[in-house]
Amino acid sequence: MINYVYGEQLYQEFVSFRDLFLKKAVARAQHVDAASDGRPVRPVVVLPFKETDSIQAEIDKWTLMARELEQYPDLNIPKTILYPVPNILRGVRKVTTYQTEAVNSVNMTAGRIIHLIDKDIRIQKSAGINEHSAKYIENLEATKELMKQYPEDEKFRMRVHGFSETMLRVHYISSSPNYNDGKSVSYHVLLCGVFICDETLRDGIIINGEFEKAKFSLYDSIEPIICDRWPQAKIYRLADIENVKKQIAITREEKKVKSAASVTRSRKTKKGQPVNDNPESAQ
């Protein structure tokens, strides 16, 4: 029998522990982001080597408590409270912060979207129609008609834009398993933040506020659905997303084949061997 009284006590202990841990991290951080409600989030902390073991012990405690709380499903604790768990980056030579666009995603069915639109339309009409609300309702009705073209269980992804988050460019030392031939490795700073051990941080940390747009997104090739009900969101059909992913995979494989053929041709040329650019002619 599951002891939910103990589970509730453990949950309260975890929340207090987590909040204090994050508060201390924010207080000593070299950089923090601000959430939409003003809360400090994503602390980036340079950690003295001598404190690494003690912080790791606290992270391990966080992990164990979170896993134990998963054994109490009836408490309905959101996973976003338990996870993610903070991390310590080791073997880092240099790190630079930069900003990128943050996107929150949620999947919904066409039926769910229609339901939410209908609910909003009823609210707008009950409050009285003016010029602004009439245009708003017209936009919602157009989106509703579009959604009615699909089965109710057709899935869509809603991507909410409009805010930024911190990323890191991390250069690891050559003996690190994360070493990337001297090139930087991108690291997404989660809401719980990240610690960077200073043992090998000989080139330090650079706090850079520049905004960097992603070079490519598979969503760039899909026409989104725009609805005034969600002014900062773009809506995509999940089937369209999967089709683009498949096409990207095919293109990637074709490039690999061409690259391999190019290497083979180059080697044969160097050796003075004949090169057949039309293999079918040899059949």
Swiss-Prot record:
Keyword Metal-binding: no
Keywords assigned by UniProt, alphabetized: DNA-binding, Repressor, Transcription, Transcription regulation
DNA-binding feature ranges: 30-49
Region annotation (Disordered) ranges: 254-283
Any GO MF annotation of the entry: DNA binding
Record flagged with keyword Phosphoprotein: no
Function per UniProt: Sequence-specific DNA-binding protein required for the establishment and maintenance of lysogeny. This protein recognizes the sequence 5'-ATTTATTAGAGCA[AT]T-3'. Binding to the operator DNA of c1 repressor is sensitive to N-ethylmaleimide.
NCBIfam families: phage_rep_C1
Further remarks about this protein from its record: Thermolability of the mutant P1c1.100 seems to be due to an alteration in the C-terminal half of the repressor.
Name of the protein: Repressor protein C1
Gene of this entry: C1
